[in-house]
Amino acid sequence: IQHIITLKSQGKLAQNYQAKFTSTFIPPNGDYQNYGIMAAIDHINALKDLVKRFPKFADLPKIYGGGSYGGYLALLIAKIAPWYVDGVIDNSGTVLPLLECIIGKDLSRPEFFFSDLNKLVGMFIKTYWTREDERLSYFFTNENYMIRSLLNSSHLTIQASVNKNIILVSYHSLKDPFNTAKDKQTLFLAYKELGYDATLHLIKDESEIDGRFIKDLNHGMRITDKALFRKELPLMLEKLQGRKSFMQENSISYPCGNKVFTFKDVENQLKLIIN
C-alpha cells in the first residue's frame, strides 16, 4: 500500500486508483457459513436446553428477533419450528437467501467490502457450498435454496397449518441496497392472507427518518437491536398477555423438488431429516 501511495505522489498512478484484493474470514473452532438452517436449529436447541435447566421458562412467550441476518433467522425459525414461536421482531431480514453469502466465490461476488483511498478488499466467509461440481456433497442444489427461502407459497401454507398464531413485526427500508423491500412486502401480504397478525413498517423516504430510531434509509436503517426491542417488545408482550405458551413436540415437512426436509423433535432435540 505504501508503494501505491508513493507512485501516486510521483504521478505514476491515477489518484483514484485502488488495488483490488479478496480475503476470506475463517471462523474459529472449525465453524463455517451454512447460511440459516444450522443456526436456526441451534437456536431452538438452545431454547430446549434452557427450558430443561429452568422448567418455569417453558410457559413464557417465545419471541425471536434481530436485524439483517438475525431478522432472517428469526423468520426462518418461525418456518422450521412454528410450534416454538409466539412472535418475531425483524429489522431488514432478507426473504430470499443471499447467494453472495452462500456461493459468493463461485459468483465472484464478495459478501461485503473494506475500502480506503488506495485499496478495495472483497470479503468472503468460509463456506463449503459450491455450484461448480454437482457431484460434490456440498453442491448447493435448488432444494437447498428452496428450504432457505421464506417466500414459497406452498411452504407458507404448510407453515400456517401448523401454527399461524404468531405475531410478526418487521421494519424495512424501501431503498434497501439489497433490493429486498418488494420481497418483504410480498411475504407480509402472504402472512396476512394466511391469517397471521403481521405488520410491516415500510420506511419509504427521508421524511420518516427521526434521527433517534430510524437514522437513514440504508440496510438496517441504523436501528439498533436495543432500540428495536425497546419499542416493539412491550407491544408484543401486551398482545400475548394471557396466551398460554407451551413446549410441545411436533414436526413439519417441506417438499423441495426431489427432496423432503423434515424438522422434527427427537429426544429433546430438533433435528433435520432429509429424504
Regions found by a protein language model. Give the residues of each.
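Alpha/beta-hydrolase active-site loop
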Residues: 1-54
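A conserved amphipathic alpha-helix that caps or lines the catalytic cleft of carbohydrate-
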Residues: 47, 51, 77-78, 188
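Residues at the starts of beta-strands that form the adenosine-phosphate
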Residues: 60-61, 86-87, 167, 197
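Hydrolases whose catalytic domains are alpha/beta-hydrolase-1, hotdog thioesterase
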Residues: 70-77
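Hydrolase active-site cap/lid region
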Residues: 79-142
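Serine-hydrolase catalytic core
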Residues: 115, 121-231, 237-238, 244-275
